[in-house]
Swiss-Prot record:
<dbReference type="InterPro" id="IPR042118">
    <property type="entry name" value="QueA_dom1"/>
</dbReference>
<dbReference type="GO" id="GO:0008616">
    <property type="term" value="P:queuosine biosynthetic process"/>
</dbReference>
<dbReference type="GO" id="GO:0051075">
    <property type="term" value="F:S-adenosylmethionine:tRNA ribosyltransferase-isomerase activity"/>
</dbReference>
<comment type="pathway">
    <text>tRNA modification; tRNA-queuosine biosynthesis.</text>
</comment>
<keyword id="KW-0949">S-adenosyl-L-methionine</keyword>
<keyword id="KW-0808">Transferase</keyword>
<comment type="subunit">
    <text>Monomer.</text>
</comment>
<dbReference type="GO" id="GO:0005737">
    <property type="term" value="C:cytoplasm"/>
</dbReference>
<dbReference type="InterPro" id="IPR042119">
    <property type="entry name" value="QueA_dom2"/>
</dbReference>
<dbReference type="InterPro" id="IPR036100">
    <property type="entry name" value="QueA_sf"/>
</dbReference>
<comment type="similarity">
    <text>Belongs to the QueA family.</text>
</comment>
<protein>
    <recommendedName>
        <fullName>S-adenosylmethionine:tRNA ribosyltransferase-isomerase</fullName>
        <ecNumber>2.4.99.17</ecNumber>
    </recommendedName>
</protein>
<keyword id="KW-0671">Queuosine biosynthesis</keyword>
<dbReference type="GO" id="GO:0002099">
    <property type="term" value="P:tRNA wobble guanine modification"/>
</dbReference>
<comment type="function">
    <text>Transfers and isomerizes the ribose moiety from AdoMet to the 7-aminomethyl group of 7-deazaguanine (preQ1-tRNA) to give epoxyqueuosine (oQ-tRNA).</text>
</comment>
<dbReference type="Pfam" id="PF02547">
    <property type="entry name" value="Queuosine_synth"/>
</dbReference>
<keyword id="KW-0963">Cytoplasm</keyword>
Amino acid sequence: MQLSDFNYELPPELIAQHPLANRTDSRLLEVRADGMNHAHLVDRQFKDILILAQPGDLLVFNDTKVIPARLHGKKETGGNVELLIERISGEKQAWVQIRASKVPKTGSTVHIYNQSGETFSVEMIGYDGRFYEVLFPDHVFSLLERFGKLPLPPYIEHQPDGEDAQRYQTVVAKNPGAVAAPTAGLHFDEVILQKLKDVGVNQATVTLHVGAGTFTPVREEDLSKHQMHYEWFSIPKETLQAIEKTKKNGGRIIAVGTTSLRALESQANSQQSSGETNLFITPGYQFKVVDCLLTNFHLPKSTLLMLVSAFAGVDNIRSAYQHAINQQYRFFSYGDAMFLCRLENIKP
């Protein structure tokens, strides 16, 4: 398939700029495929996850935590520069995206500052053709806490505020390292998590630190030429055991978000419970672990739109997205959600 197969026109007013008052207030579009692989679309509220997830199923969340990954500074020449952490590669090292009129050269220094007037300097030490490696003078995390800003997605037009600091994190977030939130998890609050437990829906976690590359557009019309970005993941032994037990007992594995799905499928492919993954899922991929997927609506021509198309069928996703546009669903990180099941895993 070609990149143009995953394009669609989205009215800009449907891009959610702020979260709703309550996490569980969002809408939920259920996409059911029949034996002819046609999509049956059911408009629901997110709280209907209590119906869609059934006793014996296993919800798998990504427990990564968004870090204040955006830094502002000046080059040695005095020009402004913005650094966005892509992924942390060591105690004092990170790969970054750089925005500047002219990118600083390897070996040069960038001076980072904050609103309190404090400064520190990072050294440019490498370039891999896409991202720049920088060396920090101290622990990356501690410096980000003092100097960094929350990295909202590029389509959110306001500067991050106190509301974003709370709502652009999931309630299960505990392992710092992500540059973007695993947005399907944003719809859950503590109350609905407990209600799911009460009705016999089990829960487990993985960690996948979402990188800034998740927002990088695919530029190759031939998808086989696209270079997928790397992200670090880890799956606890307890989660692997819960998956095995669930499948043995006839339950379904429900990935909460594409990042949870990619972590689970990466482990199944590599048989490694942690490491870096650049798994690029397109139509034709044979899913090994995940039966159902809870996910938000994704950007045109994005790798995530390709993933959900692989999962539920290209035509089904096209129909679902057009329906969502017609029905004024809210799109992207702060938007509404979809519930998808693979054809052979639909329960009546």
